[in-house]
Amino acid sequence: MLKKTYNSLLVRFPKEKSSQLLEWIKTEEDRIIWSGNTFKKKLSINSFTEHLNRTDLDSFAYFTPGNNLLTYGEVITNKSPTGSICRIIVNPMERSKGYGQNFCKDLLLWMKKKEKFNMATLNTFADNQKAINCYRKIGFKIVARKPRSRKLGGIWKDMIVMSKAISHRN
């Protein structure tokens, strides 16, 4: 486990770690929870590498001192000053230890430093209480509910849209 003191570990995600990340996505349900409808075809190293080549996408990670992948996430740049935080995932063996919360804080800090974002948004399943609690703890608020938005395990599920203003004051 990494030190509990808050010290940013955020780095750009290296494509050569893609296979380690994709090992965490074991089922179709895992894929939908993690990526929504981003990968309509089968998720593979090739489709994920193609995804990482998007010009509107910045991908980030945390690594352990032993260089094992700990977290992954993305910021999508829109034409507006709103950025979308997407595809947040924590190593399944390291969940519920605060890494997701610190990782999201670091993504927000990166967005603030870019000075082109004034709002961050994200989506999560309405019944994903752990994710909702994590995002609320760092200041996200629920701004919309999209009923029956995604099919998961044969059941249509509601999505929650959350947002947080990005202040440029010190």
Question: Which residue stretches match the model-derived regions?
Answer:
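Glycine-rich acetyl-CoA-binding "A-motif" of GNAT/NAT acetyltransferases
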Residues: N67-T71, K130, W156
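Short acidic/polar active-site loop segments enriched in Thr and Asp
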Residues: P81, F117-N118, K141
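Glycine-rich phosphate-binding loop
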Residues: G98
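Conserved GNAT acetyl-CoA-binding A-motif
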Residues: K113-N123
